[in-house]
Design a protein with these regions (language model features):
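Intrinsic structural disorder
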Residues: 1, 24, 145-149
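Conserved N-terminal subdomain of the carbohydrate kinase-like
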Residues: 2-109, 113-117
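Conserved phosphate/ATP/ADP-binding segment of small-molecule kinases
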Residues: 120-161
């Protein structure tokens, strides 16, 4: 199995690619990590340091992978934290490119917005992009309760909701 994983990278803690890549590799998955940010820690701490990777840079990395034939045989694209709205566009472009080379590939989106305890961790334009464009393009989404409420415009309190 081959996965293109477009997510955050943090030095302190385990979220995004910092949490996903090693376990997937340990079970034999070929993971191509592309980072959306390179932060000291996740933004839920309220303060962090490090760069947001521009959408154009993410697209350049995907282009380099594509030029080497790396998008052929991809089984899934995973996406997570999107610190800027250009990142969402780059992810959607990457999904389209992967599907051009690997039509059966699925797109799994973790619509990282925040959580009930600490609220929203992303800018309003990112919230809208995720809800209006990224989630509809996904085959699978993995929202937490807070994110599900935002995406659906509801306030789910139980599993049934």
């Amino acid at each position: 199995m081959r996965i293109l994983s477009i997510q955050s990278s943090v030095a302190y803690g385990h979220v995004g690619n910092s949490a996903a890549v090693f376990p997937l590799q340990r079970i034999g998955v070929d993971v191509m990590p592309v980072h959306t940010v390179c932060f000291s820690n996740h933004t839920g701490y309220g303060a962090w340091r490090g760069p947001l990777i521009a959408g154009t840079d993410i697209t350049e990395i995907i282009t380099g992978i594509e030029e080497r034939g790396g998008l052929t045989g991809v089984d899934a694209v995973l996406s997570g934290y999107q610190g800027g709205d250009s990142i969402g566009d780059a992810i959607l472009d990457a999904v389209a490119r992967v599907r051009h080379h690997s039509p059966e590939a699925i797109y799994a989106c973790d619509p990282v917005l925040g959580n009930a305890k600490s609220g929203c961790h992303v800018a309003p334009e990112v919230q809208n992009l995720i809800r209006d464009r990224v989630v509809p393009a996904a085959d699978l989404i993995t929202p937490n309760q807070f994110e599900l409420g935002f995406i659906t415009g509801t306030n789910p309190q139980t599993l049934e909701e």
